[in-house]
Amino acid sequence: MSGHSKWNNIQGRKNAQDSKRSKVFQKLAREIFVAAKKGPDPNLNPSLRLVMDKAKAVNMPNDNIKRAIDKAAGNTSGENYDEVTYEGYAPGGIAVLVHALTDNKNRTSTNVRVAFNKNGGSLGETGSVSYMFDRKGYLVILREGLDVDEEEFMLEAIEAGADDVEVSEDVFEIFTDPATFPEVKEALQEAGYTFATAELSMFPTVYNEVAENNQTQFDKMLEALEDDDDVQEVYTNAEIN
């Protein structure tokens, strides 16, 4: 996966996301609420444990996390969210996957369609672009202050069950099969490593470059989608420079 570091992409968008931290926490609270409805104990509910780790990685306050779990445990109002995935193309044929948690599918569908249409994109049918992505476990370990040989670490990660390891100056990126993700994560934690990111994510099988004349519309479309309260994640196969 050399040359397509997801971590570089995360860092490239970090400043914009930091300015919207309250919205990030709001979306994570919804994700925690949905996961916690399957059980409030993260030791018995892997889905909840995963999203809690995700929340802690962005410094979401523990009180916020607990409040979302308690809300799910005491939910008597019938509040419920459906998981919905939208697929389409951004300007220049860039594939886009949008994952949402919504209590009103009509509202979310309309908002997503407007975000595509207003910015030169087109919303497609189910399956139109999802085949271009693979679901993988994804772990990031910051190298700052870490005294470990690159080859030694790669061997350690592979022995723990990782499928692939990408090494850069700043980070180790570990990729796993979704089914083995918890075991790999636990093995590396027991070896003393901590994670800047630990999640299941979608990765393109082929990357496409965003043409210079499409960049502004592409950025506006992503911003419109990410600003929507119902949208949890936006994945693209845009080339990361």
Curated annotation (Swiss-Prot):
Comp. bias (Polar residues): 1-14
SUPFAM superfamilies: YebC-like
GO biological process, one term: regulation of DNA-templated transcription
InterPro entries, alphabetized: Integrase-like_N (IPR017856), TACO1_YebC-like_2nd/3rd_dom (IPR048300), TACO1_YebC_N (IPR049083), Transcrip_reg_TACO1-like (IPR002876), Transcrip_reg_TACO1-like_dom3 (IPR026564), YebC-like (IPR029072)
Family matches, as Pfam families: TACO1_YebC_N (PF20772), Transcrip_reg (PF01709)
Keyword DNA-binding recorded: yes
Region annotation Disordered: where it falls in the sequence: 1-22
Gene Ontology annotations for the cellular component aspect, listed alphabetically: cytosol
Predominant location: cytoplasm
Subcellular location: Cytoplasm
Any GO molecular function: DNA binding
UniProt keyword list: Cytoplasm, DNA-binding, Transcription, Transcription regulation
Family label: Belongs to the TACO1 family.
NCBIfam families in the record: PRK00110.1, PRK12378.1, YebC/PmpR family DNA-binding transcriptional regulator
Name of the featured protein: Probable transcriptional regulatory protein LMOf2365_1554
Source species of the chain: Listeria monocytogenes serotype 4b (strain F2365)
Upper classification of the organism: Bacteria, Bacillati, Bacillota, Bacilli, Bacillales
